[in-house]
């Protein structure tokens, strides 16, 4: 399951995200953060952590450096 989620994120980065201008307010980007979270915490907890991060990525949040903890 973990590898499937990471593959989906990589496909998103290659085929969808590459067509848009960069818009993530954080470093690492939300997709890279998601991969790192899934690798570190597993499919379920990593996905939940990723969703929390993605919900913070909007114009009213300053963004900045936010590594997987």
Swiss-Prot record:
Pfam families: YidD. Keywords: Cell membrane, Membrane. SMART domains: Haemolytic. It is found in: Cell membrane. Its main location: membrane. Could be involved in insertion of integral membrane proteins into the membrane. This is Putative membrane protein insertion efficiency factor.
